[in-house]
Every structure is written in C-alpha cells, then in structure tokens.
Amino acid sequence: MRDVFEMMDRYGHEQVIFCRHPQTGLKAIIALHNTTAGPALGGCRMIPYASTDEALEDVLRLSKGMTYKCSLADVDFGGGKMVIIGDPKKDKSPELFRVIGRFVGGLNGRFYTGTDMGTNPEDFVHAARESKSFAGLPKSYGGKGDTSIPTALGVFHGMRATARFLWGTDQLKGRVVAIQGVGKVGERLLQLLVEVGAYCKIADIDSVRCEQLKEKYGDKVQLVDVNRIHKESCDIFSPCAKGGVVNDDTIDEFRCLAIVGSANNQLVEDRHGALLQKRSICYAPDYLVNAGGLIQVADELEGFHEERVLAKTEAIYDMVLDIFHRAKNENITTCEAADRIVMERLKKLTDIRRILLEDPRNSARR
C-alpha cells in the first residue's frame, strides 16, 4: 500500500479514517480535507474498487473537490468524502449502514454525509438510526427530497451565464446542447432546456430511456450514439454521467464552444483545462455548476429554507460569469480562476477564526 501520509500531504488533507467491521463486511475510508469553513460535508459512495490504493486515491481526490465546491457555493462546510469498498448490488445490508452510522457518528459532527454513486437515500435511513450525521434522507424520514432538481437547475444557470459570456445574451433558445447521460440530473436538465427552446442531442447507455425521451419531446431531441456524443457539433457539450470525459483521447474531438455539465471531475488532469482554453472552448468548472445538490443538502443541515436554496443555486450564474471574466483578464484557465477564489475565501476565514470563542477548559469545569 502507498504511503498514506505522503498522499495526504499531496492533497492537503487533515484526517483520514479507515473503518472495518468484519461481521458486516464493511471496509470504508473517510477523508476530511479541510474544515476551515466548517464541518466536512460530502457523499458516501459504494464501489467495488480493485484495491485499497484505488479507493484511497478516489476518496482523497473527491474530498478535496468538495472543499472547493463548498467554498464556491458559499456554504459553511468543508470538504469530506466516504467510500465503501464493495459491490452495491450484493454487499449492502441494513446492518452495514447502521455500522456506518456508528463510525460517522463517532466523529462528533466533524463530518456529514449522504447519497452518492452506488448508494441511495433509503440506505441512510438505517445509518441515521445510529447518529444524526446524515443528510438527503427520503422525505418520509425528514429529508428534503431529490437533489437532482437543484443540481440540474445549477447546471442550467451555468449554461445561461456561459451563453451571456460567449454571445452577449443568456437566452438559450435555438442553441444546440449535447447531453451525455440522461439519468436523474441529465433528464431534468433536458426538460429545462427544451422549455426555453433549445435543441438537444442526447446519449445514454440506457437506450430505452433515450427512446422514451425522444418520444416525449419529439423533434426537440435527437438521439446520438453514446460513444460519439462528445464529437457532435453543438454550442454546448454537457457531460452529465461519468467523469474524466476531457482527456488526451477526446481533447481534439470536441466540436463545441463550451463545456458545462454535472459530471464530477470532468478534466482528467489540470492541464486539460489549458488545452481546452487553447482550442477556445469555454469550460465552466464542474465543481461550481453542479453544486445545486450540495446547496440543498447543506441547507437541510441548517434548518432548510427552500427560497434560500433557490437563491444560492441561482447565484451560480453570477459566480460562473465572475470566473470567466477573471480568467480572461488574468490570462489563466477558468479552473485556476476558481481555485484562486477558493484560496482567497479560505484565507479570509482562517484570519476570522483565529479569534477564540471560548476557552474549552471552561466547559470542563462546569
């Protein structure tokens, strides 16, 4: 196994926790990246990783991304993530998630989590019986419902801001958008785009789902092969499925003017952002435009107010514009511009939180 501390240094992490429970078969890793802004927040995914090293690399990379996403979304949480090493189709059990509830609860409010790839809200109903460190539960258990709605809305606002930057108007009527992946988020995004008069090309590994959407929206939708959707001529390419779609193999194949989508970690490496810029393709950082779901979950932990969630999600529009203009003015990539904003915000918070609120020894004396 690789040197864990070396990896933590590379990504800038505070804490990594390995969780094991032989009776349920649980093997999991929790990573807390940065808690300057508040408790760590991030989803819990379940994947049959090939090795512990692969799982560790994933949880470190994803939790760092959550720090940036929380900062840009202006929520008082830091970045965290949990990964379970296992097959979600056969390794789940109520007992396994109750054990997760104990491990996460044992962090005493330093980490909050919920659904991600391979997990669903119903899984965490069991975990929530053991601690209050879970968000995104079903409505019947006190949660606030499907996060795909605000996620899609945030991507939509990101597209509007991109259109304004590129074409001087945020109207998407008549624009061609190629959507890669029409799952929960992709389908809701498709609906929003069709409603404002955009034309959409769609692709998904679920061909039946695509056919159903074609039947629903008619000539507003064109079906495309899932292996060539990124090569389609369009105004905006929107990756809403797997990450890593911008890589050495695809970088010269894009025929779009902008990339704005909900998929996480769309760039395989930072240098791919510079390569997109060289090709005059405008890239909206994924960890900003897909932050709508995070905004809802964070607000749920603070009491939840629907109008506040909508307002913060709509603010993605202004932040995307700010990043585009900053990147242009400073001759840097959009990701570099976003990262600078995050670092500036965290520095300000660090300066503010140097002030001691209470001597912990006072509590001990009570």
Curated annotation (Swiss-Prot):
Alphabetic keyword roster: NAD, Oxidoreductase
InterPro entries attached to this UniProt entry: Aminoacid_DH-like_N_sf, Glu/Leu/Phe/Val/Trp_DH, Glu/Leu/Phe/Val/Trp_DH_C, Glu/Leu/Phe/Val/Trp_DH_dimer, Glu/Leu/Phe/Val_DH_AS, Glu/Phe/Leu/Val/Trp_DH_bac/arc, NAD(P)-bd_dom_sf
Active-site residue list: K81
Lineage top rank: taxon: Bacteria
Pathway field: Amino-acid biosynthesis; L-phenylalanine biosynthesis; L-phenylalanine from phenylpyruvate (PDH route): step 1/1
Reactions this protein catalyses: L-phenylalanine + NAD(+) + H2O = 3-phenylpyruvate + NH4(+) + NADH + H(+)
Amino-acid positions noted as binding L-phenylalanine in the UniProt annotation, renumbered to this chain: K69, N264
Enzyme Commission number(s) from the entry: 1.4.1.20
One record GO biological process: L-phenylalanine biosynthetic process
Molecular function as annotated in GO: phenylalanine dehydrogenase activity
CDD domains per UniProt: NAD_bind_Leu_Phe_Val_DH
Residues annotated for NAD(+) binding in this entry: 45, 116, 151, 181-187, 204-205, 241-242, 262-264
Temperature sensitivity of activity: Thermostable.
The family this protein is said to belong to: Belongs to the Glu/Leu/Phe/Val dehydrogenases family.
Cited function: Catalyzes the reversible NAD(+)-dependent oxidative deamination of L-phenylalanine to phenylpyruvate.
Protein name per Swiss-Prot or TrEMBL: Phenylalanine dehydrogenase
Organism: Thermoactinomyces intermedius
